[in-house]
């Protein structure tokens, strides 16, 4: 309930205050995970400023995942992200930032730094390192109460095909710091996301996304299942 109130407050500010949000973006996305047989809905509001600051807030809702099978719909998590762009020259940019994730288990902090390179006016490459630190403890494989902290590396490729279409690829490697395992029975896991955007109007951009999430699917007491994510969404400039 508190997370819902926080999200409502931020959305109200974004929609009602022109001084705070003059060109915000609202992103609505739905998806399905084939291994876990789970449906998701995401609502995200983001804003960038000319002075280099960027911020977003989003909520994620699942129907059956993360031991939440008794409810048809529930607000599983809310996260807030802030970063600042430092232009090194006309092609290179460094973005230090922080992601704060709220869930029923507790709060997770993810400080990161991202380096991006505009190879051409249509082609961009990026790489990011993020450290996910949990402010709460959970039982590890040895039975001890520890923090399930994670090292995360991301790679990005974005290509503007033409005035109508943009293609993006994000590859991710996760590595658990302590005595925990992913659903693939390993301390590490990978993800690959492929997105195709259609710039229907200057203010409306629908898109489709396919993700391969390694063998991280969990369903009916079984894990190590091949996990595919199929998503469709649309972004609106407000």
Curated annotation (Swiss-Prot):
Pfam families: KdgM. It is found in: Cell outer membrane. It is a multi-pass membrane protein. GO terms for biological process: monoatomic ion transport; oligosaccharide transport; sialic acid transport. Residues 24-25, 50-52, 87-91, 118-122, 160-164, 201-203, 237-238 are periplasmic. The keyword Cell division does not apply. The keyword Signal applies. GO terms for molecular function: oligosaccharide transporting porin activity; porin activity; sialic acid transmembrane transporter activity. GO terms for cellular component: cell outer membrane; pore complex. Outer membrane channel protein allowing the entry of N-acetylneuraminic acid (Neu5Ac, the most abundant sialic acid on host cell surfaces) into the bacteria. NanC proteins form high-conductance channels which are open at low membrane potentials and which have a weak anion selectivity. This is N-acetylneuraminic acid outer membrane channel protein NanC. It comes from Escherichia coli (strain K12). The lineage of its organism: Bacteria, Pseudomonadati, Pseudomonadota, Gammaproteobacteria, Enterobacterales.
